[in-house]
Amino acid sequence: MVSAVLDSRFNVALWIFQRHPKYDVVDALRRCQHRCWEFVDPHPPRMQRQLSSTNLSFHITDGCHPYPAVQADGSVSGGLEWSGADDGDCKGSAWGSQVYARSAWYNNKYAIMYAWYFPKGKGRQHVHKLHSGHRHEWEFAVVWVDQPSADHSNLLGVSMSFGPSFHKEAPVQPEHVVGSSIKLDSYSTFWGAKQGLRVTTDIGTTQDLIQWEQLTDAARASLTETNFDIDEAVVPVEMPLKDDVFQLKLNSTYPF
């Protein structure tokens, strides 16, 4: 049974860019990995309770911590050039963190996709073949439940992105759940060719949640139109919640 009470960690607020005039748009685009402010709303809609009740415990074995990808005015993170340590300059943002969510019915099951943005990620490039990483990374997980209810839905399974493929667990094993949250781990393969998610017994942290529909029009447009695959990674980097990708991901990661 999936059941939880919404707490302040999952409050979602729209940050108004004009409240911080010293950060102009150019600066935000250039150094947003250290300047992007998360979305937080003190009055989340009813659906927020369902998304929060299945929000995921996020542990990091390897690589960057998740960051906000976009601000309310549409300014997008410029990411980090791949260099140095896997988590170099990306161990967490003082301006908050973020997990993005979008949900839909699929094959008579209710799918909730959660997506995390990272300023850089592991994985080969087509052009610089000796590089073991690239600018920008998106990882996602799909939680499958029987109905969109915070108090009366049953957890059926989880799918997790992993390079060009995915991991799955259906049903989810008890050791991979804490409270009503599935425990996930962000990691990469030994040679760094793939980065993705897996279930774990380790407890991680949670990020402030924002629904795709709650983003400003400018933020949604920027996430849709921005080319996050500027380094031409062998596994293309794309925002999984946007319209032309979301349904394809549900289809390709269906675990039943």
From Swiss-Prot:
Protein name from the UniProt record? Necrosis-inducing protein NPP1
Q: What is its main location?
A: secreted
Keywords, A to Z?
Answer: Secreted, Virulence
- Recorded GO CC terms: extracellular region
Q: Where is this motif: Conserved undecapeptide motif?
A: 111-121
Name the species this protein comes from: Phytophthora cinnamomi
> Under what conditions is it induced?
Addition of glucose or sawdust induces a small and progressive increase at 2, 4 and 6 days, and a significant increase of the expression level at 8 days. Expression decreases 12 to 24 hours after infection of Castanea sativa roots and increases again at 36 h, suggesting the existence of a complex mechanism of defense/attack interaction between the pathogen and the host.
Function per UniProt: Secreted effector that acts as a pathogen-associated molecular pattern (PAMP) recognized by the plant immune system.
